[in-house]
């Protein structure tokens, strides 16, 4: 099992699909990486040589922000908004939708499970 960017990549899958197991690399970036390195898209991970795995690893480290670094940057951006006290930061702080969605009836994913109101019956 190849290990790239701290993630164990499944060996039976095609390289393009297997790279999407890394946080921060989707199908588009995976295709770009494979084209840059020059590996055929239909090749499977267990068919890769050590040199090819090393090339993929270097391409990801050089050109993309993945896994822990990406998560840390995202968390720092949210923390910055919260520290500024801007509208988006307040919405993050209160656990409400940030991008203008309605909250009167929906937004259960962001707000959590519904809270029962005492004395309210049908």
UniProtKB/Swiss-Prot annotation:
It comes from the Bacteria. One of its GO terms (cellular component) is small ribosomal subunit. One of its GO terms (biological process) is translation. Part of the 30S ribosomal subunit. Forms a loose heterodimer with protein S19. Forms two bridges to the 50S subunit in the 70S ribosome. It comes from Rhizobium leguminosarum bv. trifolii (strain WSM2304). Residues 99-122 are annotated as: Disordered. Pfam families: Ribosomal_S13. Located at the top of the head of the 30S subunit, it contacts several helices of the 16S rRNA. In the 70S ribosome it contacts the 23S rRNA (bridge B1a) and protein L5 of the 50S subunit (bridge B1b), connecting the 2 subunits; these bridges are implicated in subunit movement. Contacts the tRNAs in the A and P-sites. Belongs to the universal ribosomal protein uS13 family. The keyword Metal-binding does not apply. Keywords: Ribonucleoprotein, Ribosomal protein, RNA-binding, rRNA-binding, tRNA-binding. GO terms for molecular function: rRNA binding; structural constituent of ribosome; tRNA binding. This is Small ribosomal subunit protein uS13.
């Amino acid at each position: 099992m190849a290990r790239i960017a701290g993630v164990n990549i499944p060996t039976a899958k095609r390289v393009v699909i297997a790279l999407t197991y890394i946080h921060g690399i989707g199908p588009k970036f995976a295709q770009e990486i494979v084209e840059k390195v020059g590996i055929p898209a239909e090749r499977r991970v267990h068919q890769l040589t050590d040199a090819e795995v090393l090339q993929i690893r270097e391409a990801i480290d050089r050109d993309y922000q993945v896994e822990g670094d990406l998560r840390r940057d995202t968390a720092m951006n949210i923390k910055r908004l919260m520290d500024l006290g801007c509208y988006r930061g307040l919405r993050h702080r209160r656990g409400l939708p940030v991008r203008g969605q309605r909250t009167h009836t929906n937004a259960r994913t962001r707000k959590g499970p519904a809270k029962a109101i005492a004395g309210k019956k049908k």
